């Protein structure tokens, strides 16, 4: 089953991998305006993201995400390490990963795409611009694109 506004039967499961509580709050606010039902799960570090995806420990009952929003600057495992493990694993490589980070470093951008990130977005620091970028992101990744089944 593909996820599309006209035939959606369930909420779009989104995993946000973000250690900054302010950015988590802003992302939640931005996603609330979606025309499609979304369910946001949040983990605060790279190791926890992998536990969530592998359904280990406290994440044994975690939903499989349709989309992952991944920060690069994370404790325990960096976003690039998480991305490398995701895209190397047959069960996770089709899940689209949107890198959503403060870094605008050319090396980070190149490495993310080399590791098969589906998109790289530098987080705007301005509140209004952040909401706009998240709105455009959700319109594309949630309301327009056909995502693989969870």
What are these regions (language model features)?
Residues 1-16, 21-41, 47-50, 54, ...:
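Non-catalytic signal-transmission and effector/linker regions of two-component phosphorelay proteins
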Residues 19, 71, 79:
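Conserved phosphate-binding and hydrolysis motifs of nucleotide-dependent enzymes
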Residues 20-23, 75, 91, 103-107:
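Negatively charged, flexible loop motifs adjacent to catalytic sites
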Residues 32, 58, 80-93:
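Short amphipathic alpha-helix used as the core "switch/output" element in two-component signaling
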Residues 45-48, 78-84:
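Acidic catalytic/metal-coordinating carboxylates
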Residues 70-71, 101:
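Active-site residues of response regulator receiver
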Residues 87, 110-114:
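Alpha4-beta5-alpha5 "output face"
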Residues 118:
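Short, glycine/charged-rich "phosphate-handling" switch motifs in NTP-dependent
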């Amino acid at each position: 089953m593909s996820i599309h506004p006209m035939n959606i039967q369930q909420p779009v499961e989104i995993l946000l991998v973000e250690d900054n509580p302010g950015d988590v709050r802003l992302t939640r606010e931005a996603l609330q305006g979606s025309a499609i039902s979304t369910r946001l799960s949040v983990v605060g570090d790279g190791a926890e993201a992998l536990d969530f995806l592998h359904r280990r420990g406290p994440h044994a009952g975690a939903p499989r995400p349709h989309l992952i929003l991944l920060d690069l600057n994370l404790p325990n495992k960096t976003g690039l390490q998480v991305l490398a493990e995701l895209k190397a694993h047959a069960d996770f490589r089709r899940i689209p990963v949107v890198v959503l980070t403060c870094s605008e470093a050319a090396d980070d951008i190149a490495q993310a795409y080399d590791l098969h990130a589906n998109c790289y977005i530098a987080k705007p620091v301005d509140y209004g611009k952040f909401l706009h970028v998240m709105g455009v992101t959700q319109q594309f990744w949630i309301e327009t694109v056909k995502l693989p089944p969870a």
